[in-house]
A protein has these predicted regions:
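Soluble catalytic domains of membrane acyltransferases
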Residues: 21, 38, 42-172
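Extreme N-terminal tail/first-helix region
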Residues: 2-43
Length: 172
């Protein structure tokens, strides 16, 4: 946000905001701006536009609202945010909508672990930004789980940190 309280377009060492362009993208960006402004959050960093794939470590995750806030931030940056969900979420009449919203299904009933399933998901996509809450729960937890690291390492993608600073209401 600038001094007048308006959310500024991302700029700086990474250049412009991220990949998607077009009327629908701008509509989503506008909705994201309205949501972020309404709840009092602002963006404190630029998006690295030359990173087509990443694991985004999103912390802390202490509320269901954090997910919606991260989706709004992704809309502001014009990126599609992916997230892991159990495979049953993408089945049924609304499964297509869940998948379209960014869910990457994890099949828990197979012997293949989630890290390998995410590695395969990264391998089959041209771009993918997977948001992972390292706490593994919405409770305050100083001991992070390490799955995000293993996913990034096995997929050969960078880790990006997304920090929700509740004190200043700035996402960095």
């Amino acid at each position: 946000m600038d001094k007048t309280g308006h959310v500024k377009r991302a700029s700086g060492p990474f250049g412009r905001s991220a990949p998607y362009a077009g009327l629908f993208s701008e509509f989503i960006r506008g909705l994201s701006w309205v949501y972020l402004r309404t709840i009092g959050w602002r963006i404190g960093s630029d998006w690295p536009v030359h990173v087509p794939k990443s694991v985004i470590v999103a912390a802390p995750h202490t509320s269901n609202w954090d997910g919606l806030t991260m989706v709004a931030v992704a809309g502001w940056y014009r990126i599609k945010l992916n997230w892991m969900g159990k495979a049953s979420l993408v089945r049924g009449p609304l499964g297509w909508l869940v998948k379209r919203s960014g869910c990457v299904p994890v099949e828990r009933s197979t012997s293949q672990d989630a890290v390998e399933q995410m590695r395969q998901a990264f391998a089959t996509r041209e771009t993918m930004h997977l948001a992972v809450a390292p706490e593994g729960t919405r409770e305050a937890n100083p001991n992070w789980k390490t799955g995000f690291y293993h996913i990034a390492r096995s997929a050969g993608v960078p880790l990006l940190m997304a920090v929700l600073d509740y004190r200043t209401r700035v996402l960095r």
